[in-house]
Amino acid sequence: MPKSSNFLDIDDLTTDELQTILDRATALKHGGDNAQFPGQTLGMLFEKPSTRTRISFETGMTQLGGHAIFLGPDDIQLGHGEPLSDTARVLSGYVDVVMARLFNHDDLLEIAAHADIPVINGLTDDAHPCQTLADLLTIKEEFGGFDDVTVVWIGDGNNVGQSFVIGAAMVGLDLTVVTPSGYGMDQSVLDQATALGHPPTIADTPGAAVSDADVVYTDVWISMGQEDQRNEKLTAFEGYQVNESLLANNSAQVMHCLPAHRGEEITDEVLTGTRTLVWDQAENRLHAQKGLLVELLSEN
């Protein structure tokens, strides 16, 4: 049973629960019992737009026998005109589970504090745990598990990276984080990984870090809402691009959560090349989130 009925970051699950969700996702992907929740409804709150998050959750809930309702910025004014606490209470009377993709993580916490139904973090500025589920499912499929798998994160210490650091520690991945000075993960995230017994190695030189990597993972340098930092970040991240030269002397597979800024953090040749896991990773958002929905709805 989950430590809470919500999924606000990856550590809302125990390690055993995380493994159970990944196993269930694999079973569902390969033809397991899908239509488990007829008549149930997922409410999807989108303050930030997304292709993968909306389609994967809406498709997943439909495949599980339920229904999903999309509420975008024009449909619901989060925190404007009506307190978030009231919105959460009202939604609790209409739907069975809420997925929220927001800017401010505190807004997500406010919704979760006043909802009587499970709340899922579809992304905030601080965390993206649904992406971590898909990432871990992809690695498990590719390597048969997590033992002796070495992953190198190259780029910004953003929300995707922070959830991945914690998820990697939970399953025991050998992780190295390579970021420019001033753009690393929050210290609280690194401390949490240390408490879990698997802190990442911190480095600032991509070339040396990837020599023994099984997976090289990158993400955009300029996240949504950071457009005014573009020139500053392009300068700071020079030399951190995942390209054919960086990968020339190793056999690492490549991951990226998408959308990619081709020619910035990754080249087109690498993104679409023979060593990419990116498209499996994108598909696995669907299956991992179905595994999560089954976990939450079965308990509630």
Swiss-Prot record:
It is found in: Cytoplasm. The keyword Cytoplasm applies. The keyword Transferase applies. Pfam families: OTCace, OTCace_N. It catalyses: carbamoyl phosphate + L-ornithine = L-citrulline + phosphate + H(+). Gene3D superfamilies: Aspartate/ornithine carbamoyltransferase. GO terms for cellular component: cytoplasm. GO terms for molecular function: amino acid binding; ornithine carbamoyltransferase activity. Reversibly catalyzes the transfer of the carbamoyl group from carbamoyl phosphate (CP) to the N(epsilon) atom of ornithine (ORN) to produce L-citrulline. This is Ornithine carbamoyltransferase. It comes from Haloquadratum walsbyi (strain DSM 16790 / HBSQ001).
